[in-house]
Amino acid sequence: EVTVQGVGGHGALPHMAADPIVAASGLVLALQSIIARNVDPLDPAVITVGSFQSGALATIIPGEARLNIGVRTCTRGTRELIRKRIETLVSMQAKAFGCEAEIIYNPGISYPPGYNTPEHAKLVHDVAVELGQDPARVEMRGPFMFSEDFAFIQEVVPSCYFGLGNGKSRSLHDSGYDFNDELLVKGPVFWGR
């Protein structure tokens, strides 16, 4: 979580404030430069700003802005590089607009990438095809970037992470998601194979 602390004020007097929204907005854009210019393009990494909160009124410059940032990498080295670059950009972006910033890390949400072993992925693929699934929809090559507890198991036990899908409805993280009750029958059949 990043908090950009500015100086609030009236929207008609921006020269008497330090606008944290402007500083944080610039930061959102600058964060993408880390992936584009600091990370090896052959080393998968993602930075997501999943939440941006600030202010409540159209005519008031708020005193602070908060960003929640998610980082996904496949290597610890890249994760550390991104962490250092985020710290630098947060500090510099805040200072550029007369603000200050604080970063709070939650180390409990740092997950390793997951990897499917070829033999287990083939087993899942074969069962999916046997059950009438589209083979193209069950392929998962390379690491996956989800924050998934199962990745800790995969560090020790060769395995395959997969999803059954939800049919034609919206996907899991969509606000309109509706669980497909047919999965209550399909899931156990799949696992039983």
Functional labels for PLM-detected ranges:
Residues 1-29, 33, 42:
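Fold-level recognition of mixed alpha/beta catalytic cores in primary-metabolism enzymes, strongest
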Residues 25-193:
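Metal-dependent amide/peptide-bond hydrolase catalytic core
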